[in-house]
Amino acid sequence: MKIYIIRHGETNGNLRGVLQGWTDEPLNSKGRKLAQITGKCLASIGFDIAISSPLSRAYETCEIVLRENRNPVPTIEVDDRLKEINFGCWENLGITKKNYQIPNKNFNLFYTNPFLLENSYDGESVCDVCHRTEDIYLELISKPRYRDKNILLATHGFALRCLLRQVYEDKTDFWHGKIPDNCAVNIIDVVDGKGTLIGDDLIYYDKTLAVNPYTPI
C-alpha cells in the first residue's frame, strides 16, 4: 500500500496570512494551477481510492489532481477526519507581523510546539486533530478494503502533520522544519502494517511559487 497525502493548493486566505481552519475558503487561480502541475506529475500513478477533507480547497485540489491522471480514477470520498484544525473564534484573524490579531500572546507556540498552545475556547486542541487523523490512518492500514492499494488523501497543513506523526521517527518535532507548502505531497509506504515515509514534502512546481506567510513573529 502507498498513501499519497497532498496539502490543498493556494487560497486567498493563505495570501492574506489568516487562520482558515474550518472556514471554507476556495482555491484561487494559482492554487488551481499548482494542483494541475502536481496532478500532471502524478499522472502515471493509478489511484485506487481517493479521500478528501470536505472543505472545498482540499476537495477541488483532489479533483484537479485526478483530472490529470492517465488511469481510470476513483470517485472521491469525503471524510471529516481530514479537515483542518478548527480554530473557532480565531478563524480569519491575521497572524503576520502586518496584520496580527490573535488574542493570545503565546501564539508563537503554534510554530514551535503547538502542544503547549492553549486553543481558543471554541476550537479544537492539537490532541483532538491528532486523534482523528490517527483514527483514519489506522483504519487505512488495517482494513482489507485498502490493502495493497494506492490511496490519495487531500487535506490541510496542520492535519497533514498530525497524520504524519504516525510515521515520523521524532514525534517531538511537530512541524519537521516548516508548515508544508501548498500542494506538497508526502508518500507513506505501508508493508505488513508498518508505514515508512518515502516522500517528504515533495513539490512538483517551481519553488519560487510557494507562498508561506505562516512563520513566527
Language-model region placement:
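Extreme N-terminal starter segment of soluble prokaryotic enzymes
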Residues: 1-4
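Active-site metal-binding loops of divalent metal-dependent hydrolases
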Residues: 9, 157, 201
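Loop-to-helix element that buttresses phosphate recognition and phosphoryl-transfer chemistry
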Residues: 10-60, 122-134
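Phosphate-coordination/substrate-recognition cap region in phosphate-metabolizing enzymes
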Residues: 37-107
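Alpha-helix capping/helix-boundary segments
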Residues: 57, 159-160
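Acidic, low-complexity terminal tails and accessory targeting/binding regions
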Residues: 85-99, 142, 146-149, 165-217
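Short glycine/proline- and acidic residue-enriched helix-loop micro-motifs
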Residues: 106-128
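GST-like fold's C-terminal all-alpha helical module
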Residues: 129-157
